[in-house]
Structure formats: structure tokens, C-alpha cells
Amino acid sequence: MLLSKYFLPVLKEEPSEAQVTSHKLMLRSGMIRQQAAGIYTWLPLGLKVLKNIENIVRSNMNKAGALEVLMPCIQPAHLWMESGRFDNYGKEMLKFQDRHDNTLLFGPTNEDMITDIFRHNIKSYKDLPKNLYHIQWKFRDEIRPRFGVMRGREFLMKDAYSFDINEENAVKTYNQMYQAYINTFRDLGVFAIPVIADNGPIGGNLSHEFHIIAETGESTIYYNKRFKTLKDNPNIDVEEIKSWYAAAEEKHDVNKLPISEQEITSSKGIEVGHIFYIGSKYSVNMNALINDEHGKLTPVEMSSYGIGISRLVAAIIEANCNEKGIIWPSNVAPFKVSLINLNIHDSKCVELAAKVYKELSAQNIEVLYDDTEARAGSKFATHDLIGSPYQIIIGPKKAADDIVELKNRKIGVIEDIEVENLIHYIK
């Protein structure tokens, strides 16, 4: 992509309305623009990150055996009345009437609707287990939306719902999805800690939250110091990870610790995922019954699995930035490489930049080629801000010898590389 053709409205100054780093950087780098309180337009750069995260989440759900569906944003209120949740959500739920005076709502979650889909289409234990997921926009009318997309009113979620014949099988599915979540965050290139948590209004008695460590987190989590080894060794067996102590603040009890208090540390965390074993709460209330192997009608056992995709964008930035801007993990970066031509009027620079751009593109490496008239300092500031993992810098002096500068955005090291060897460093 040529920067001269791209839509990248970067801001030089910090926006006064932004309170946290991720919100500031998302506005400054031209990822989002606010349309109303807690409601944002995703501009091209931000949308690329959102789609990259969405695709990684989707890939891991598919590998776990979940099947993708797409439920509507707008839901009939009678399903929520039937499940007993309609009055509990209060003013956070956006409700309205259509022209026929039917009460509708903008879905804040989907347990009620997926249970309705299940009960009308699956009747026998022979059709179980089933695990259905969708990726859809939601709305909760937060009384005080803040921190940009971290705590917005409109947000993108991945929600999965599993259905099993009994508790034993349901817990087995739950553990498989726990594994899928560990794999998902590894693939995203982020350090997420799974902590034992409350189920809240969803219901149920088994629950884990997944937190990214960040100073701006709203939750305090307590966890075994061994979790820090995941940063350097992400391939630790999931069963070992599950044996390590980690708990949300409301579940942490210093009098009931399985390890010494000296082995535990605490941090602020941003919740980016939450999985629940619900049991039969919704199936009983909504009559979602299955014929078991003895021909007896029994309520189906359910679990729910959420990942905040739009919130993940902000959380990843909070954990991966410095004073110059964002430092994207490679798998979610909007562009893996920023190609910076320092002199677009120098024929050798133009020739070399075109060659590099063509070779990287042929390898399906996403490149943002800065072919603008901007000064060198301005170009460096822009590309540090948007956070491409690599910057390839082409200037007249070194271009004459077919040499470019390669900057690793994360560690800040710049080295001279011969063009013919460049591809090996990027891959």
C-alpha cells in the first residue's frame, strides 16, 4: 500500500479527551474517530488490526471444533423475558419498539438467543456435543463510557456457546475451550493470564477470566510468579498452566492459598476474555430439553465463551507501546513493514524502494510504502507512531551501494542490510 494513496489522518498533538495511552495512540495514529460517547468509526489502519485479531480468533475457534454462525444485533425482548433476564440488565440494555409495537433490544449478549436456536433445532443426545460461535457487534449503554474502545458502548465480541448432555461432558468441552483460549492469545502475541473468577450475571459455577497485564487495568489479579515465564516460553503445556495459582480479586483469599504468599504477585489487568460453565440455567428456563440415551427429556448443559475483539486492540496497545508510539506484535500489526523512502526524487532510492516493495509483496508481507514528500523526521515519527514491527529505511548514500537500513521497532536496533539478503531478516 502506498502511503500517498492511503487514508492515515495522524495527529501531532495528544488529544485532550483521551485519558489512557491506548486511546491517545489510537486517535493519534488515525485508527479510530469518535462519533458519539463510546461509539467509534474504525478507520483503515484500525480496521486492519481489528480484522487481524478477528481472523486469529476465528482460526482458533475452528481448530477447537466450534462452528461459526451469525446472529443478529437486534433481538426480540420476549426471549429475555422468558429467560428471566430482561429486567435484570437495567438501563445498560438499549430497548425500543418497532412500528408494530414489538419490543426489541440491541443485544448486549446472546445466551438467550442461542438457547432459542438450539431448542428448536436439536432434540437428541446423538446430535451432541455442539459448539457454536459468532463474531458480532454489541451494545451496552454504559453510564460513563471511557478509555476509548476499552470501555465503549458499542464493541465487537466473539461469543461461543457449547451444548453437552451432562456435566462431565460439559466440563470436558470447557477444558478444550480453555486450551483454545491459551492458543489464541499465544497466536496474538500477547501475555494473557487465566484467573479463576465469578460468573456474574451470566450464571454458573465455573469461570475463568483472561487478563492482559497493564497499568491501566481496572481489575487487580493475583497470580503465581511462574506465569512470567510464559513471556519467554509460550509453549508451556496447558495442563501445567492450569495448575498455577491465579485469581481475580474477589476470589483471592490469603487464608486459602495453595502456595506460599511469597510465590504470588499482583498486577492490574485488562479483562479480554471470559469463559463460563453455565450448566442448565438457560435450558431449564427456556425449556431446551434433549432426549438422552434412555429416552428421558433432560436440560442441556451449556457453557459460554467470550473474547472482546475491539477491547483487545486497546489492551494490546497498553501492553506494547513506548513514548514514540505503538509496537505491534507481528501477527496483529496492520502492516508488518513500513518502507520509508527518504528522497522520492532520487532515482536510485525510487528504484530500490520499488524493488523492495515488489519482493516483500510477492511474499505476502504487508507493506506500507511511504512515498510522500514529508521530511525525514516527520516520516520517522509517523511510522514509530503506527507501530509496524519493521522499518526499512532507504536513503541516497546507502542506496547507491544497494544497502538499506532495517529497524526493529520493538528493540530499536538499526542495522545495514544488503537488499538481496533483506527478505531473510523480515521473515
UniProtKB/Swiss-Prot annotation:
Annotated Pfam families: HGTP_anticodon, tRNA-synt_2b
Alphabetical UniProt keywords: Aminoacyl-tRNA synthetase, ATP-binding, Cytoplasm, Ligase, Nucleotide-binding, Protein biosynthesis
Enzyme's top EC category: ligase
Gene3D superfamilies cross-referenced by the UniProt entry: Anticodon-binding domain, Bira Bifunctional Protein, Domain 2
Reactions this protein catalyses: tRNA(Pro) + L-proline + ATP = L-prolyl-tRNA(Pro) + AMP + diphosphate
Single GO MF descriptor: ATP binding
Tagged with keyword Protein biosynthesis: yes
A Gene Ontology biological process term: prolyl-tRNA aminoacylation
InterPro entries assigned to the protein according to its UniProt record, in alphabetical order: aa-tRNA-synt_IIb, aa-tRNA-synth_II, aa-tRNA-synth_II/BPL/LPL, Anticodon-bd, Anticodon-bd_dom_sf, Pro-tRNA-ligase_IIa, Pro-tRNA-synth_IIa_bac-type, Pro-tRNA_synthetase
Cellular component GO terms held in the UniProt record: cytosol
Subcellular location as annotated: Cytoplasm
EC code(s) of this entry: 6.1.1.15
Record flagged with keyword Kinase: no
NCBIfam families: PRK12325.1, proS_fam_II
Subunit structure comment from the entry: Homodimer.
Function of the molecule: Catalyzes the attachment of proline to tRNA(Pro) in a two-step reaction: proline is first activated by ATP to form Pro-AMP and then transferred to the acceptor end of tRNA(Pro).
Family: Belongs to the class-II aminoacyl-tRNA synthetase family. ProS type 2 subfamily.
Entry protein name: Proline--tRNA ligase
Gene name for this UniProt entry: proS
